[in-house]
Amino acid sequence: MKYKRILLKLSGEALMGEQKYGIDSQVLIRYANEIKAIADKGVEITIVVGGGNIYRGIEAAATGIDRVQGDYMGMLATVINCMALQSALENIGLDTRLMSGIKIEQVCESFIRRRAIRHLEKGRIVMFGAGTGNPYFTTDTAASLRAIEIEAEVVLKGTRVDGVYTADPEKDPTATRYTTITFDEAYAKGLNIMDMTAFTLCKENELPIIIFDMNRPGNLLKVLEGESVGTLVKL
C-alpha cells in the first residue's frame, strides 16, 4: 500500500444516491465494502462525512435561521451521516469509533487526538463528526485539520467526478483531467478543489490531496495501491 494512514473525505450529497434528500442505503453498503477492501490491507482509516444531504449551515440565512445556529445544525447532520456509515461498516465486521467535535456523550466520544491515534493503532476505523466543532468552518476544513492532527499521509476526497479538470467537462468537451497539479497551480487557475482554509491547511502542512470518483468500484483500493486514479494535488 502506498499510504499507511489516510483520511477519507466523503460529501453528504454522495450519500443521497439518486435521491434528492437523505441517505441511500445502497450507497452506504457500497461505500462500506470499498472501505473494507482497504481496511483488510492494513490501512489505518479515518473518515469525515459532510452533511449537505440533510442540512447546510451556509443556507441558514435564507430560511431566517442565524448562521451560527445553522452551522451547528449542519454539524449534527454530519453526525447522523457518520452514524449511518458506522452501522454499515460494523454490519460487515469492521471495528469503528465515532468521535465528535462537539459533546454528544450518549452517542459518541468527544474528539481527543491521542485517543483517536490509539484507536487507529488498534485497527479501528475512526470517524470524525460535527466538523471542527466551530461555526464558519466547512467539513473540508475539518477533514484537513483532523488529517494533520492524526498525522495522516494523505487526504482522499471521494466525489462523484474522477478528478480535477481544466474546465467543466459537462460544458466543455475539450476539457482534460489533471493527473497531478501543485497547490500553487490549482490556486492560480482558480480550481475549486476545497475551500481556501482547507486548501491552505493542506499546503502549509505538505499534506497531499487526491480527488477521485468514489462511485467507481475499486477506485479507493487503486488509489491506495498507487495507481494513477483521479487528481493528485501536492507541493
From Swiss-Prot:
<comment type="pathway">
    <text>Pyrimidine metabolism; CTP biosynthesis via de novo pathway; UDP from UMP (UMPK route): step 1/1.</text>
</comment>
<dbReference type="GO" id="GO:0006225">
    <property type="term" value="P:UDP biosynthetic process"/>
</dbReference>
<dbReference type="InterPro" id="IPR011817">
    <property type="entry name" value="Uridylate_kinase"/>
</dbReference>
<comment type="similarity">
    <text>Belongs to the UMP kinase family.</text>
</comment>
<feature type="binding site">
    <location>
        <position position="71"/>
    </location>
    <ligand>
        <name>UMP</name>
    </ligand>
</feature>
<keyword id="KW-0418">Kinase</keyword>
<feature type="binding site">
    <location>
        <position position="56"/>
    </location>
    <ligand>
        <name>ATP</name>
    </ligand>
</feature>
<feature type="binding site">
    <location>
        <position position="165"/>
    </location>
    <ligand>
        <name>ATP</name>
    </ligand>
</feature>
<keyword id="KW-0963">Cytoplasm</keyword>
<dbReference type="GO" id="GO:0005524">
    <property type="term" value="F:ATP binding"/>
</dbReference>
<keyword id="KW-0808">Transferase</keyword>
<dbReference type="GO" id="GO:0033862">
    <property type="term" value="F:UMP kinase activity"/>
</dbReference>
<dbReference type="GO" id="GO:0044210">
    <property type="term" value="P:'de novo' CTP biosynthetic process"/>
</dbReference>
<comment type="function">
    <text>Catalyzes the reversible phosphorylation of UMP to UDP.</text>
</comment>
<feature type="binding site">
    <location>
        <position position="168"/>
    </location>
    <ligand>
        <name>ATP</name>
    </ligand>
</feature>
<dbReference type="InterPro" id="IPR015963">
    <property type="entry name" value="Uridylate_kinase_bac"/>
</dbReference>
<feature type="binding site">
    <location>
        <begin position="132"/>
        <end position="139"/>
    </location>
    <ligand>
        <name>UMP</name>
    </ligand>
</feature>
<feature type="binding site">
    <location>
        <position position="159"/>
    </location>
    <ligand>
        <name>ATP</name>
    </ligand>
</feature>
<dbReference type="InterPro" id="IPR036393">
    <property type="entry name" value="AceGlu_kinase-like_sf"/>
</dbReference>
<keyword id="KW-0547">Nucleotide-binding</keyword>
<feature type="binding site">
    <location>
        <position position="51"/>
    </location>
    <ligand>
        <name>UMP</name>
    </ligand>
</feature>
<protein>
    <recommendedName>
        <fullName>Uridylate kinase</fullName>
        <ecNumber>2.7.4.22</ecNumber>
    </recommendedName>
</protein>
<comment type="subunit">
    <text>Homohexamer.</text>
</comment>
<dbReference type="InterPro" id="IPR001048">
    <property type="entry name" value="Asp/Glu/Uridylate_kinase"/>
</dbReference>
<feature type="binding site">
    <location>
        <begin position="9"/>
        <end position="12"/>
    </location>
    <ligand>
        <name>ATP</name>
    </ligand>
</feature>
<dbReference type="Pfam" id="PF00696">
    <property type="entry name" value="AA_kinase"/>
</dbReference>
<keyword id="KW-0067">ATP-binding</keyword>
<dbReference type="GO" id="GO:0005737">
    <property type="term" value="C:cytoplasm"/>
</dbReference>
<keyword id="KW-0665">Pyrimidine biosynthesis</keyword>
<feature type="binding site">
    <location>
        <position position="52"/>
    </location>
    <ligand>
        <name>ATP</name>
    </ligand>
</feature>
